[in-house]
Design a protein with these regions (language model features):
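A general "terminal functional-core" signal
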Residues: 2-41, 48-50, 55-57, 133-378
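N-terminal low-complexity, Ser/Thr- and acidic-residue-enriched intrinsically disordered segments
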Residues: 18-113
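Short, flexible active-site-adjacent loop segments at beta-strand->alpha-helix junctions, enriched
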Residues: 65-67, 120, 183-184, 246
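Short, functionally important structural connectors and interaction interfaces within domains
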Residues: 72, 95, 106-109, 118, ...
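Alpha-helical structural motif
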Residues: 84, 110, 118-122, 160, ...
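Charged, often glycine-rich, active-site loop that binds/positions anionic groups
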Residues: 107-131
Length: 378
């Protein structure tokens, strides 16, 4: 019988088939990615989170009484002060820094809004009270009806997400904005944790890309914990520059996410105020020579305070005020709008420190609060 095919010919045909299959797979993946990007853009453009706010009527400070978590006392089983946000607002009002009627009320993020970043599978998983209990680290939540978990826990979180997204728009218009909430920096597109159920930082930046024509963002994450959520989300996005100063001895110890940090400052438990501020000053000066931001996202966790049970650092209240002032001066020097998120902070004293810091920013003319602030310029 005649030899029709040589082994060389067979191998050549096999190679062509493999290449062809690979090309089809790449083309299919590319097509899916393009479709996802189109859907993302459509969702952002259709969103109602970017409400119009008159500067004559409101200051760029975002807050809602819906931010606070309170149901059956279960929230007290987590060290986080679940009413911290209302305490900050009350202190600012009582101190004459901010009139309640001039605070901006955000819109709650809808499922379509959240799908800009999150997967369907992840959002569906939040219909399980057990999953939410794992994310919030409050075990009894697992035994509650999910409608109650949605109402009393996830609704406040979604409201804060709306506040973070809106803050970017306000900052673009006014130069700065503060969300008295948000900063859920442990959550990424497909996973929550550390009391963070939604990736508000990632969402705010994605909205800023599309709606604000912003293409260079710096995240300055000064919460005591590593911001592994946004680090994972922006793994392949060099439009975002990340500075993260965190206690490397504590949660989450996400070594894979650490590779995404542009300027990582791994602190040790017990780091004191002077050392902390010196390191921050050094990193801000370095960043100023490397990256020119069009938006600064400042995650201003107060779990760095001495006595915080989870942060384990030894920064004084005055040190937090100086820290916040340094970051706002950095943004001012860079001529970049800035948003501040209150993020973590697990002591009852955190709210007072945050309010005092905002009051200091107003006194130093780093923010303008004509509704009630006063103080000498520096």
């Amino acid at each position: 019988m005649a030899k029709i095919w040589s082994w060389v010919q067979v191998d050549s045909i096999r190679s062509l088939c493999v290449v062809s299959f690979h090309q089809r797979a790449v083309m299919a993946a590319s097509s899916t990615l393009q479709e996802d990007q189109v859907k993302q853009k459509q969702r952002i453009e259709a969103s109602k989170l970017y409400i119009n706010v008159s500067p004559d009527e409101k200051d760029p400070v975002v807050y809602s009484s819906s931010y606070n978590v309170s149901f059956l006392g279960i929230e007290k089983l987590h060290p986080f002060d679940a009413s911290k946000w209302s305490h900050v607002q009350n202190f600012l009002s009582d101190d004459g820094v901010l009139k309640q009627k001039r605070i901006v009320e955000p819109v709650e993020a809808t499922r379509d809004d959240l799908l800009v970043v999150h997967t369907e599978k992840y959002l569906d998983s939040l219909n399980s009270s057990y999953v939410v209990a794992q994310i919030t680290e409050v075990a009894p939540v697992a035994f509650l009806p999910n409608f109650l978990v949605q109402w009393k826990l996830l609704h406040p979180f979604r409201k804060q997400v709306g506040g973070t997204v809106l803050s970017a728009k306000l900052a673009k218009e006014r130069g700065w904005a503060i969300n008295i909430g948000g900063g859920f920096h442990h959550c990424c597109a497909n996973e929550g944790g550390g009391f963070c159920a939604y990736a508000d930082i990632t969402l705010a930046i994605q909205f800023a890309y599309t709606r604000l024509a912003i293409s260079r963002v710096i995240i300055i994450d000064l919460d005591a914990h590593q911001g592994n959520g946004h680090e994972r989300d922006f793994t392949n996005d060099d439009r975002v520059y990340i500075i993260d100063m965190y206690n490397e001895d504590i949660y989450p110890q996400d070594f894979k996410a650490r590779k995404r940090i542009n300027q990582a400052v791994a602190l040790k438990s017990g780091t004191k105020t002077d050392r902390y501020l010196a390191l921050l000053s050094q990193e801000l000066k370095k960043a100023a020579t490397i990256f020119k931001p069009e938006l600064v996202v400042y995650n201003a966790g107060t779990d760095v305070l001495e006595g915080d049970p989870l942060g384990r650092l030894l920064v004084s209240p005055e040190g937090v005020k100086q820290r916040d002032e340094m970051v706002f001066r950095f943004a001012k020097d860079q001529k970049s709008p800035i948003i501040m998120l209150t993020s973590g902070g697990y002591m009852k004293t955190s709210a007072r420190v945050i309010a005092d810091s905002i009051k200091n920013l107003a006194a130093k003319r780093l923010i303008s609060l004509p509704s009630g602030s006063s103080g000498s310029s520096s």
